[in-house]
């Protein structure tokens, strides 16, 4: 049937409303802006400028412009732009980001109602105008796109229909911000080179309060999201500058916002202790199956065309018969050549299909890169790229889902090829959710392995972050800006910066001056202190990342036996269900069934499934009793002897324990420092909770607490405790009733940090005999200790805090110290300590802790406070902890300390003094403390750093020369080895020939057989 006959058939049309519908795919506004940057990157642009031009007459008050220096578009390319869904980039081997032929339209229409595009390529200048305002005012339902073209040299129209050209330019002058031909040509002149593209978006979308969605005024170097609070939001969510910095995994294009360069990042080069892992899987088949299906359709179509051409050639050859005229031979040869060409194409398509089918069976290989973000530890999670373009960011996987400190601060980076996972149209997610979840699961497993490999938890997580300046317990607080912390962070992660000319990435050696001053924005290779990388012609060195291996824990014999038993039981249940099924072979068998079976409606679940046993949570919660408050002396004496309450007892054992504690001791306690003899108790039998109360966690990374079993509890060995501490806090109980009871409390505590500590406060009245037994004068004097800033040694570590309560006993004063910055669940928030013991000492008071009233009272009784602190310092002078601070009132000790520090400083400078420093070591030894303070240490450090770098370079050159010598020696050895092997092989061949000449019946095929035969022959002669 001729194609002209199809003109009478109905056609699908694209309505004007689709422009708005298509734009709603971008829920994330920065994703729409990124679509326009993607187009510039796919056009091989090396620079893109994003800027705003004020136009008060337009909706939003400004126009948003995107100008790049890419290859541009000719008129035919521009025509393809207005065809929704058509893209020349859609090839399996393509590394370009564009796939769907929809990004320019959907992205620009999400930002504003109208856009106009100016592009240059070769000798043509084309303009494309897509306007919803034009369609609304003209009442047009179809999508009409003016598309005029000019000659770039003469600026004359390039068209065969001047009437059409006039209508197109008239619409542009009427509905665009450029109302004359001169203004339109001015936009073309902004494209400075011979090629490039300028996209201008106007009539911007507004928020509910009438302001534009994009804020271009608050920060002249950035484009921000309006009406989004920056507190608690990642910077990439509200700052387009931050989002553009990590938009590509390997940036090769300079991005400017309002004329200011964006400092793009290679995430893999910004991490501490990076490590990569290789992951292979057969699960990623969706994209490969789609490609195989397409290749099969193409191969079948090509095969049909080839068969049809071959059949046509045979028919023509038979029809011609004996006709051997020249025209007949030419016609036959043309048909045969066409058939041969189509057959070759069909064979190529078939081979491509077979190759893709074979690739479908092969596993897909991905590379995960993990590292610690020591600059911003709260910016952690997985950054998932597709064809080098960011799709998902800050995805929490594996242990990070627990919201603890485990794997906190770790960033993962992966670039997923298009053939493994396909992104959605808005490039903010992946199309196949099932395979994406499988990817996240795999990344979680490798993340847990990485956390084990870097051994941060083994050396202490808090200690690790303290070393880099994270001194606050609040996880979201930034690190300290003190110089030594900044230097340490800079030393651990080498600086990787991009050249502004060649766009190559260079890793710089550590420079002390760069920590304070930073690097220039327009950095070039000639500024590199490394002489081997100080030219743009030098090759870009790849980052060397150590390779890690996922070590899966082998299953134990019990786990394998349990899994096998469950599988056998499952198969037995299936077999029983199959035996109960009666096959129906005829209509008579169906009539034999009971009426209720044939007429009963289908129910997916039996009724008994919805009738589970009643939860026993209410019973457990009701029976759980708290420890009553007691003021008896024996209990107070026991607490003085440091009975550490870290193991909470079951509810029904509380009364029994209290009865034992409240009994009078057999012998009175003579000294507080003596340890109390533990009262032996028989191991009780604890009834396990019902399954409805105790939840089962399937999380493989969560450390499961031991469940309360129906077996006797093993008696714990006796551990000596510190006699001067009485810890009031308890470790969080694993019982479900306590967890549910304190759910609201945990939610409130989560705001203070990453961890919460459940408190069970013991009132201060438990630590006193009675109110009548205390001396009022002593109590009044002791109450002045409140607010003192002290330090307590507990469980082998020192913690600082304030005295919040004071109790007076028999010649003993007890302080209740509330600690600060205690992030761990296993550590108490406060404790009672004995004043004057060796485990507590005074430190400098903190003015921030005292209230206004307390500060006024302190000023009134300043002399009494000084006397008390002096007495307390005398009592704590025998402390063995290294944290004890000296008495600041002793001038002699101060002079000795200063002299000692000056001597230490002199020794350090004398040892590290550079040879080229203007001050000699002899002059340095004659300096006093004031002269040492005025010494130019920064210049000294800089010269020392230069000398150290020269020394390292000399070592590097020596090592390189030795490596070259070793490589040359290895090459010579390999050459000799090859020559020896060739001689040996030639000798074997000659021996085999000689043996065959001597013995004609011999048949030796392999070299091993020849060696064995010769060995037997020699041994037999002997």
From Swiss-Prot:
Its main location: nucleus. It is an enzyme of class 3 (hydrolase). Keywords: Acetylation, ATP-binding, Coiled coil, Hydrolase, Isopeptide bond, Magnesium, Metal-binding, Nucleotide-binding, Nucleus, Phosphoprotein, Ubl conjugation, Zinc, Zinc-finger. GO terms for cellular component: nucleus. A zinc finger (CW-type) spans 490-544. Protein is abundant in testes but not detected in other adult tissues examined (at protein level). Detected in germ cells with a distinct developmental-specific expression pattern but not in somatic cells such as Sertoli cells. Required for chromosomal synapsis and meiotic recombination in males and females. This is ATPase MORC2B. The gene is Morc2b.
């Amino acid at each position: 049937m001729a194609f002209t006959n199809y003109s009478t058939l109905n056609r699908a049309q694209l309505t004007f409303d689709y422009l708005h519908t298509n734009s709603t795919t971008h829920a994330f506004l920065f994703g729409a802006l990124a679509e326009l940057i993607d187009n510039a990157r796919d056009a091989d642009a090396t620079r893109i400028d994003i800027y705003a031009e004020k136009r008060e007459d337009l909706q939003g008050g400004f126009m948003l412009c995107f100008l790049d220096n890419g290859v541009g578009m000719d008129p035919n390319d521009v025509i393809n732009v207005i065809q929704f869904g058509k893209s020349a980039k859609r090839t399996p081997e393509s590394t370009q980001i564009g796939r769907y032929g929809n990004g320019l339209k959907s992205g620009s229409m999400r930002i504003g109602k109208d856009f106009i595009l100016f592009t240059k390529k070769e000798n043509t200048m084309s303009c494309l105008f897509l306007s919803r305002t034009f369609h609304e005012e003209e009442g047009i339902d179809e999508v009409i796109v003016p598309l005029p073209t000019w000659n770039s040299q003469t600026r004359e129209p390039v068209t065969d229909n001047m009437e059409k050209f006039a209508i197109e330019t008239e619409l542009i002058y009427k509905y665009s911000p450029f109302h004359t031909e001169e203004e339109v040509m001015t936009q073309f002149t902004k494209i400075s080179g011979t090629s490039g593209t300028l996209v201008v978006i106007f009539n911007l979308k507004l928020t509910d309060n009438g302001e534009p969605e994009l804020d271009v005024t608050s920060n002249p170097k950035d484009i921000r999201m309006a009406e989004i609070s920056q507190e608690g939001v990642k910077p990439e969510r509200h700052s387009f500058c931050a989002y553009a910095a990590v938009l590509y995994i390997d940036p090769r294009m300079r991005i400017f916002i309002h004329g200011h360069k964006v400092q793009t990042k290679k995430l893999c080069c910004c991490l501490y202790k990076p490590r990569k892992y290789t992951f292979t899987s057969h699960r990623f088949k969706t994209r490969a199956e789609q490609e195989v299906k397409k290749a099969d359709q193409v191969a079948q179509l090509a095969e049909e065309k080839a068969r049809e051409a071959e059949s046509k050639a045979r028919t023509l050859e038979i029809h011609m018969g004996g006709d051997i005229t020249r025209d007949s031979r030419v016609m036959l040869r043309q048909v045969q050549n066409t058939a041969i060409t189509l057959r070759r194409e069909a064979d190529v398509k078939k081979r491509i299909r077979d190759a893709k089918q074979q690739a479908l069976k092969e596993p897909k290989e991905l590379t995960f890169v993990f590292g610690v973000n020591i600059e911003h530890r709260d910016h952690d999670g997985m950054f998932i790229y597709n064809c080098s373009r960011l799709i998902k960011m800050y995805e929490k996987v594996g242990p990070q889902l627990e919201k603890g400190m485990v794997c906190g601060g770790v960033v993962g980076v992966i670039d997923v090829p298009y053939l493994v996972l396909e992104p959605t149209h808005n490039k903010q997610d992946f199309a196949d959710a099932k395979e994406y979840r499988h990817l996240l699961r795999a990344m979680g497993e490798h993340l847990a392995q990485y956390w084990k490999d870097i051994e941060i938890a083994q050396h202490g997580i808090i200690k690790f972050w303290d070393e880099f300046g994270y001194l606050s317990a609040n996880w979201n607080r930034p690190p300290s800006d003190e110089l030594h912390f900044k230097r340490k962070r800079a030393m651990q992660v080498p600086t990787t910066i991009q050249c502004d000319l060649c766009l190559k990435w260079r890793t710089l050696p550590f420079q002390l001056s760069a920590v304070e001053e930073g690097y220039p924005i327009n950095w070039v290779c000639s500024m590199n202190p490394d002489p081997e990388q100080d030219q743009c012609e030098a090759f870009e060195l790849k980052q060397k990342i150590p390779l890690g291996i996922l070590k899966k824990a082998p299953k134990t014999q019990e786990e394998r036996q349990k899994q096998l038993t469950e599988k056998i039981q499952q198969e037995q249940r299936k077999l029983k269900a199959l035996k109960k099924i009666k096959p129906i072979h005829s209509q008579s068998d169906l009539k034999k069934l009971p009426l209720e079976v044939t007429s009963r409606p289908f129910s997916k679940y039996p009724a008994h499934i919805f009738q589970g046993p009643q939860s026993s949570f209410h019973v457990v919660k009701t029976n759980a009793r708290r420890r009553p408050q007691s003021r008896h002396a024996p209990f107070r004496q026991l607490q003085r002897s440091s009975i550490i309450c870290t193991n909470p007892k079951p509810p029904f054992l509380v009364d029994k324990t209290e009865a034992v504690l409240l009994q009078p001791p057999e012998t009175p306690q003579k000294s507080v420092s003596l340890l109390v003899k533990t009262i032996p108790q028989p191991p009780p039998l604890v009834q396990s909770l019902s399954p409805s109360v105790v939840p089962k966690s399937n999380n493989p990374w969560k450390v499961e607490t031991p469940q309360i079993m129906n077996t006797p509890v093993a008696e714990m060995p006796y551990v000596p405790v510190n006699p001067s501490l009485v810890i009031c806090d308890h470790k969080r109980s694993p019982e479900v009733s306590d967890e549910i009871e304190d759910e609201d409390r945990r939610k409130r505590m989560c705001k203070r940090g990453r961890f919460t500590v459940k408190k069970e406060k013991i009132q201060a009245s438990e630590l006193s005999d009675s109110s009548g037994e205390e001396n009022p004068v002593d109590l009044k004097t002791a109450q002045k200790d409140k607010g003192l800033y002290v330090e307590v040694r507990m469980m082998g570590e020192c913690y600082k805090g304030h005295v919040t309560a004071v109790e007076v006993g028999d010649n003993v004063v007890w302080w209740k110290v509330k600690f600060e910055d205690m992030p761990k669940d296993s550590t108490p928030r406060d404790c009672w300590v004995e004043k004057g013991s060796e485990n507590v000492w005074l430190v400098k008071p903190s003015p921030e802790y005292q209230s206004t009233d307390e500060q006024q009272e302190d000023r009134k009784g300043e002399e009494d406070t000084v006397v008390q602190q002096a007495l307390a310092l005398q009592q704590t002078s025998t402390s063995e902890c290294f944290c004890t601070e000296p008495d600041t009132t002793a001038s002699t000790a101060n002079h000795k300390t200063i002299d000692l520090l000056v001597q230490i400083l002199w020794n350090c400078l004398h040892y590290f003094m550079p040879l080229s420093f203007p001050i000699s070591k002899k002059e340095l030894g004659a300096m006093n403390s004031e002269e040492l303070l005025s010494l130019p240490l920064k210049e000294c450090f800089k010269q020392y750093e230069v000398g150290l770098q020269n020394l390292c370079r000399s070592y590097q050159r020596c090592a390189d020369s030795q490596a070259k010598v070793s490589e040359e020696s290895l090459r010579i050895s390999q050459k000799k080895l090859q020559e020896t092997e060739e001689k040996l092989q030639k000798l074997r061949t000659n021996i085999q020939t000689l043996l065959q000449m001597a013995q004609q019946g011999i048949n030796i095929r392999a070299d091993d057989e020849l060696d064995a035969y010769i060995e037997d022959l020699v041994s037999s002669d002997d």
